[in-house]
Amino acid sequence: MSSVGNTRRARGGCTRHAFGGFIFLDASKDAGVAYRYIPPGMSKVPSHKLTALSRLIGGTPLLEIHCRYRGREQRIYAKHEAYNFTGSIKDRMALYILQRAYLNGEIAPGDVIAEATSGNTGISFAAIGRALGHPVRIYMPDWMSRERVLVIQSLGAAVIPVSAELGGFLGSIRMADEFARDSGRVFRPQQFDNAANVQAHYETTGPEITAQLATLERVPSAFVAGVGTGGTVMGLARHLRERFGDVAAHPLEPANSPTLRTGHKVGRHRIQGISDEFVPSIVKLGELGRILDIWDGDAIVMSQRLASELGIAVGISSGANLLGALEIAHEQGNEACVVTVFCDDNKKYLSTDLCSDEECKEHYLCNQVELLDFRVIQPCASGYATRT
């Protein structure tokens, strides 16, 4: 690794390193944020575009949500990922995978990007892929929200809907693989199997959270996240384990569709983006804390209340994540510092039950939640490139 470059302190005590190539903040045992050098001689990499995109991804605010839960005041810390380029946490993974693919010579300008997704990943690859000049094809189950399809199409990507009869999510993956096999010059990100998905959150999301909490002189006591690909929860699990030892990262899934517990598709649910019919290969349950279960209706009501009571407009999985985090914080007591993610905002769910009247059933956890206030902990620096 080259040692030639400029180094300066960033906001919140983070160090930023400027080199001739890209500058990344990375996880380190000795400091909350360190660097990793990406040489400028990537495989015909459109470096100016990647640099520009990297400035739009990561470095998101951390929200401190002040609640009363089961009669006890709690503060939950939520990374507000709607501030990314396309408005979701998936931008982190998409940019990281494409940067690494260029570095390893796995993709070249003009190659087609083909991916299977429930929506947010497709939006991220459509936007970032088109910005880099790639044709993009997105395969997705045909029951995802209409907004997702329209956004992807507006970004110049082709959307191939896959019915339940054609295999749904697993059928989407199969069809993307078949297209890549039968066509020339196709790059498959393979988000469910790609270790770079985990690495993206290990190198960016985790260190950002650690640095932001450090400004409050706090360290995380647990992490909670719904599992779609599993990249977020696995990346944070690794980061927390290396930095703080015995700090659990808890995977979360819909109580009415417990894929992680059963190992296969079971039941139906309305939390788009998690529990996608199978357990991804990058998910290692033995490295995670216990699985948390949240009813989809409970998550919907909680997301609705975050918007209507605090003005924080988030997607359905964010409501589930908040409820799961509150459960863990309640178990840990007054010293808990539980972190989660608000993966996106509510704009891609306007045609779903998120914008319908949802019955708040007696057994729902949201009945135990009183939302009091929130404050914003600004990021110290993005986990992606910050200077050139």
At which residue positions do the language-model features occur?
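PLP-dependent amino-acid enzyme catalytic core
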Residues: 22-388
